[in-house]
Amino acid sequence: MNNQPLLLCNNLCKKYQEGQVLTEVLKNVTFAINQSEMMAIVGSSGSGKSTLLHLLGGLDTPTSGEVLFKGHSLNKMSSGARAELRNHELGFIYQFHHLLPDFNAVENVAMPLLIGGKNRGQAQKKAFEMLAAVGLEKRAHHRPSELSGGERQRVAIARALVNEPSLVLADEPTGNLDLRNADSIFALLGELNRQQGTAFLVVTHDLNLAGRLNRQVEMRDGYLQDELTVTGAL
């Protein structure tokens, strides 16, 4: 049996230099996430949560430390290899859906498949199946402007999962939604986790929603803490 973590983060540090000012955003962050695990990171704005997700997704490089995905160091990968990793192994969900406004829902969801080399027919078939999985098969041919906020975020989730990634990185995925839609989105993530075995690493301000996940940690002043402080996490 393979006990290797899906993703391992070792002593990750990130510093930014602006003129004479050195800002340390992440300080010796170490943790692992396993296959099919759902983990929440809570923390106040500016605590380093989004920076951490960018490093984990290979969108930025650390000042020191390393990120290993399935035992392979992102630090040692070429930019092309990291792009391939993002296309095939990682999914991304953001607070704002970032859907392409001139394309309908099924075309938006199919985009990662087309980028990955699938033909249009295969991509559209898989995209429609994914929209059905998030309950939007009847809205497949609507553009983002014709969808509600909750529906747009469901399309974004379908797009993130269409390549069947091992891990989805979600940055405030319910931040722009009302409580009812936020609750529905988190329920959907849990259902997809059970059905597909996808691991989720979710950044959120909502402690109640974070409590639904397997594990909760807090980003505080650049450090990752296992103990949550309610005032610091809201």
From Swiss-Prot:
PROSITE patterns the UniProt entry points to: ABC_TRANSPORTER_1, ABC_TRANSPORTER_2, LOLD
Domain ABC transporter: 7-234
Compartment annotation: Cell inner membrane
GO CC field: plasma membrane
GO MF assignments: ATP binding; ATP hydrolysis activity; transmembrane transporter activity
Keyword line: ATP-binding, Cell inner membrane, Cell membrane, Membrane, Nucleotide-binding, Translocase, Transport
Membrane topology: Peripheral membrane protein
Protein's job: Part of the ABC transporter complex LolCDE involved in the translocation of mature outer membrane-directed lipoproteins, from the inner membrane to the periplasmic chaperone, LolA. Responsible for the formation of the LolA-lipoprotein complex in an ATP-dependent manner.
NCBIfam families membership: LolD_lipo_ex, PRK11629.1
Subunit structure: The complex is composed of two ATP-binding proteins (LolD) and two transmembrane proteins (LolC and LolE).
Name of the protein: Lipoprotein-releasing system ATP-binding protein LolD
Annotated source species: Photorhabdus laumondii subsp. laumondii (strain DSM 15139 / CIP 105565 / TT01)
Gene (name only): lolD
